[in-house]
A protein has these predicted regions:
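Second-shell loop/turn segments in exported
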Residues: 12-19, 45-49, 178-180, 223-226, ...
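Catalytic His-Asp segment of secreted/periplasmic serine-dependent ester chemistry enzymes
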Residues: 210-287
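Serine-dependent acyl-ester chemistry module
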Residues: 79-237, 255-256
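Residue-level recognition of beta-strand->loop/alpha-helix junctions
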Residues: 45-47, 205-207, 249-252
């Protein structure tokens, strides 16, 4: 096997909103023809377009079966709020897998979490669950089309640019200063490192838009007030140092004009900047 396998997990910025497959982070890393440990670097995109650390941990657990040489976990503060962990459909509809992670690795999950979709006996039958089966077969057909065309999303000719002017609002998920580790799903992040085991994992704080518009002295962007994000970065540095994690903070590595319809969605040029920043870390991680 002459492939140095890199699995990239994250949100819609990794998945590639408004990007063609070759323009995504994984696509651009593959185009660079990097060589690590005498092998050709091959990056695999396991991004999924919702933001939740617990969702990412689920994907990490599935990725293990592909025996990656390196895992890159792209994340951002909005993946950490406690109330977001199980609300994403990928988690809400896979309670059994989440409970398995809780049992095996100590992932913190409430016993009575109401976000999980619980099916009754009728809903588990083929007739009662026919909508899900219809979706399943339709997606298999779509998959053939996506593979044949390389197109797996709608590319609008025009789109609304990411917001850069804001109200004078310092709020973030009802949290109050100072931000603490208890406010965030740190347990899910720790679980992710347990799940990958001996496989090296880069923890990357992904680039975000830094606005210079109205009230940008209060908010960096639509997602984050400055106070919250600044404290989050301090927490991430402290956590990584305490646990010996390889942490790469690229929060301000891409200029504001290289974002598209969101404060975390990059243009192809922005993705290229990100790939160039990450390439040296990939080359350092030979088994």
């Amino acid at each position: 096997d002459d492939e140095f396998r890199v699995v990239i997990v994250g949100d819609s910025s990794v998945w590639g909103t408004l990007l063609k497959p070759e323009e995504t982070l994984a696509g651009q890393l593959n185009a660079d023809n990097l060589n690590a440990c005498g092998k050709t670097v091959r990056a695999y995109n396991l991004g999924y377009p919702t933001i939740s650390l617990t969702k990412d941990v689920m994907l990490l657990s599935y990725a293990r079966q592909y025996d990656p040489d390196l895992v890159i976990l792209m994340t951002t503060l909005d993946a950490f709020p406690l109330e977001k962990q199980t609300s994403t459909p990928l988690v809400a509809n896979n309670e059994e897998k989440v409970r398995e992670l809780a049992t095996s690795y100590g992932l913190r999950v409430e016993a009575d979490d109401s976000n999980f979709e619980v099916k009754n006996f009728w809903q588990k039958t083929f007739v009662g669950d026919r909508r899900a089966w219809a979706d399943f077969f339709r997606l298999q057909i779509y998959g053939v089309m996506w593979s044949a065309t390389g197109i797996d999303q709608f590319y609008p000719a025009e789109y609304e640019k990411a917001q850069t002017d804001f109200e004078a609002d310092e709020s973030y998920h009802d949290l109050t200063a100072p931000l603490s580790e208890d406010d965030l799903a740190i347990n899910a992040l720790e679980t992710g490192f347990q799940v990958v085991g001996e496989t090296p994992m880069l923890l990357v704080n992904e680039p975000m838009l830094i606005s210079s518009g109205a009230n940008s002295d209060i908010r960096y962007n639509f997602f984050y007030p400055r106070w919250t994000y600044d404290e989050y970065r301090k927490i991430m540095y402290a956590l990584s140092e305490r646990n010996g994690w390889t942490y790469v903070d690229l929060w301000d590595s891409v200029p504001a004009n290289e974002f598209t319809n969101s404060a975390i969605h990059l243009t192809p040029v922005g993705e290229n900047m990100l790939a160039e920043n990450l390439a040296p870390y990939i080359l350092e991680n030979c088994k």
